[in-house]
Amino acid sequence: MKTKIYFPLLLVPLLICIMLPAQAQVSIAPTMLFVQDNTNMSEIYVTNTSSVAQEINISLRFGFPASNEEGTISMRYEDEEKRAIYSVDEQVRVFPRRLVLQPGQSQTLRFQVMPMANRPDGMYWARAVIASRAVSPDVDDLMLAQGEVGARVGVVFEQDIPLFYRKGNATTGLIVHQVFTDIDQERMVLRVHATRDGNSPFLGTIVAEMFDSSGAMVQNTARSAFFYFEEHRRIEIPVEDMESGRYRVDLHFDTQRRDISARDMVQAPRQTHSIEVEI
C-alpha cells in the first residue's frame, strides 16, 4: 500500500506553498524548467538527501496555479479546454524517466520538448512530477521469515515543478481591472484583479510603494507574482506605525525575478497602477 505526500512548488516567494510534517526525500535544483525552441532541452539535478536508496519516477501533467477572489492560490489540473491550447505534457521526453539513487547520490535529468511546428508562437507549459519512495526490498522477505502477515506501507513523495516551453515570439503584459483594499490597524491588504495580456503567462514581481501627502515614500514592499490568466493577487503593507491621513500607493508590475534568469523571462515594459487610500 502506498501513501502519497504531495509538494506543489509554485512560483511564490521561496517557492514553498505547502508545509507538511514530513520532509521530501530528494532535493531538486532548479525548481523551474525553461526550454527554448532553439534547443528544446533543459535539465534539473536530483539528489537523494535521505539515508536510504530512493526510487525516482518522473511524469508530466498539465496544471497551473489559480486564485479565488480573495487571492488564495491553489493548483488547478482539471481544465481540459486550457490543456488543449497550452499544454506540452505529451510532447516532453525525460532521460532517464526512472532511476534509483543511493544516499547522497545525484543525477541529471534531461527534459526534451518535441518540436511543435503546427502550434502558434507563445509560451506553453506542463508540470513535472518527481515522485520518490524508499527502496526496501528486504522488508517482505523479513516478514515472511518471521511468519508475519501484513500490509507493507510505502510513502511516496511527489514534488511538482513547472516546465515552460517558449516558442517563437512570446509576449506578455497585464491588464489591471481593479485594486481592492482591506485596511485594519496593522496592515493594508491590496488585492489586484488583473488579466495577463499577450500569449504567455506574466511571471515577475509586484512592487508596492506608499507615499504621504508631501510625496515622501513611507513604505515599500515587493512580492513575486504570476498571472496565467485572469487572477487575483494579494500584497500586504504594514501600516501600524503610520499616521492617519490620505496616501498614494503605486503598484509596479515588473517582469523581473531574482530567482529567474533574464534570458528565461518573457519581458514586458514596467506597468504602474496608482490608487489613493485613507488610513
Residue ranges of model-derived segments:
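Short, acidic/polar linear motifs in exposed loop/turn regions
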Residues: 50-52, 117, 196-200, 214, ...
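Short acidic, flexible loop segments centered on an aromatic residue
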Residues: 57-86, 195-214
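Terminal connector regions
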Residues: 114-163, 245-279
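Short, solvent-exposed loop/turn segments enriched in Ser/Thr/Gly
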Residues: 29, 37-43, 107-108, 120-127, ...
